[in-house]
Amino acid sequence: MRRILAFFAVLATSAAMASAADGRWRPSPADGFDWQYVAPFDFSRPTSTLNLDAFDADPALIADLRRRGVKPICYVNVGAWEDWRPDRRQFPAAVMGKAYVGWEGERWLDVRRIDLLLPIMRARFRLCRDKGFLAVEPDNIDGFENETGFPISRAEQLRFNRAIAEAAHDLGLSIALKNAPELAAELADVYDFAIAEDCFKWDWCDMLQPFARQNKAVVAIEYPEDGRDPLKHCAEAAALSIQIVVKRRELDSWSRRCR
């Protein structure tokens, strides 16, 4: 047991030393998380981090958050095209896949075409950095498990996910593994923290333990739909070193969390 504890202590120390060496901020397991993408907003509520949309966020707001010690995290959709984004015409027809069922105006992207997609994603990450964000939350990095219109393999998805992590790190940004639990074991050494949607609802939170074992932050966004109370999982979350944040799916200012 002592050897095991010593091993994890070394991992935590190594992570802290790496952060100091590269100058990149990383959220810790103790940091509080929040997301606000749509009105009503409340930016006065205490939180350690705040996730905002890359294109919609005002640089003045980000600067104010940072003055108050809040670490801003930048939402970027890297795996699906959105028809309302200002850079939507930069995506060539060759990467446009099937409609993303349930999300109007979105289509899956062919992440096998790193040569075509990575320059666009680098530009988006650069926008995040220039606005003052400290990390990125890349969405839809699990296309290989979905009906995208392309025969994306697990290996090809991993290759894309590693490429965008490198792109973020090159700009001094931390990056979250969002969902994609089947890839967590292979990407925990590359990604800086993990975000999971409804992992307690669907019973896969334990698959993110490769992050927790490295003392990296793991946060579960749980949506209280169908009368479900996600806070009943607080004890289980604590045992897994996972923070629960309960949000409405539209991600306005409303939230609940474990005490």
How does the language model describe each region?
Residues 21-259:
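Glycan-processing catalytic domains of CAZymes
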Residues 6-15:
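Bacterial N-terminal signal peptides
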Residues 1-4:
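Positively charged n-region of N-terminal signal peptides that target proteins for export
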Residues 16-20:
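Sec/Tat signal peptide C-region and signal peptidase I cleavage site
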